[in-house]
Amino acid sequence: GMLPVSIGPSQSSILVPVGGVSSFKLCHGVLLHSAPRTAMSGTLWIVKTTLPGEMNEAEVGMWCQSIIESNLAACVDMKRVNSVFRWEGEIQNASEWDIQMKTSESSKNELISKIKSEHPYDVPQIVWWSVVSTVEYYNWVQG
């Protein structure tokens, strides 16, 4: 098939054939072949959620520390953000804590389950994606 790809600020797009083609990135019309994964890198997972802005820094720190103590993530980043979202038909604007966790493939599903079971929101944001890191960082996250 064909995949439309944006080619810059004009939002013009071109059609790129997909299927049976090596992976690539298209950047302003320049085709860049991605390097194959080698022993120089490893695949990890970033799991992201948010916590209520009403929680103070110590409370958020304790929540994050419990993730580390359970050995489900190697590192947890936390920062304040402002979020705009629709909840129960109303547009809301709220201060929240953005929480980003680095974890391994073997711990990802258990980490997601822990977040679901202990999260203060009825419908928490829980999203995740794989990332490639240096082999040294990969080994550190693996434990």
Role assignments for model-derived ranges:
Residues 1-143:
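Positively charged, small/polar-rich N-terminal and surface patches that mediate targeting and assembly
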